[in-house]
Amino acid sequence: MESCNFEVPISYYDKRFSIDAVKLLPGQYFVTTQDKMLVTVLGSCVAACLYDPETGIGGMNHFMLPTVNKTASEFEKTQGMAAKYGVHAMEILINDLVKAGANKAQIKAKVFGGGKVVPSFVQHDVGKFNAEFVTDFLSTEGIPILASDLCDVYARKVYFFPSNGNVFM
């Protein structure tokens, strides 16, 4: 079983890791029960890699902002772009993991991104806001963060293996 949002992520075969892979772009998420690798590139965005180590079910999201701003269109709030906001992306990811058979009490997290990659944004450190949001959200949900690489001033490329929880950067 697999689930994703409105816009289907790009699937390909990764020769380096010898595995089917799914590339996530900003505002996308993907949940799978299969042995696949999920890949994304992050700047100020954050990716939450969640998995149930007992079932091997896992998924990743890639959100751009912590919450919906007041000027977002009604379409963005309710349809395909909802996953670009952390508040929706996290709920959707957790709900789809449970629908796929994961036990919410067993879900573990690894979170990445939130870099300050555009230094001219002095007033609004979006990466910091994203990083604070994801750690607070997971704490509230009772989902432990086993690994993280958040904030700082660099971009990241994340390779996540949901079946076993391994992550490479």
How would you name each of these model-derived features?
Residues 2-16, 20-36, 40, 54:
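Phosphate-centric recognition/catalysis
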Residues 4, 19, 24, 41, ...:
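Conserved active-site and cofactor/substrate-binding residues in soluble primary-metabolism enzymes
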Residues 11-12, 27-28, 34-39, 47-49, ...:
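A generic local secondary-structure boundary/capping motif
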Residues 33, 52-56, 161-164:
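Short acidic-glycine loop/turn motifs at beta-strand connectors
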Residues 48-49, 53-103:
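Glycine- and Gly-Pro-enriched alpha-helical subdomains that act as flexible
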Residues 105-113:
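Short glycine-rich phosphate-binding loop at a beta-alpha junction
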Residues 116-127:
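Phosphate/ribose-phosphate-bearing ligand recognition and processing surfaces
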Residues 127-169:
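Divalent-metal-activated hydrolytic enzyme cores
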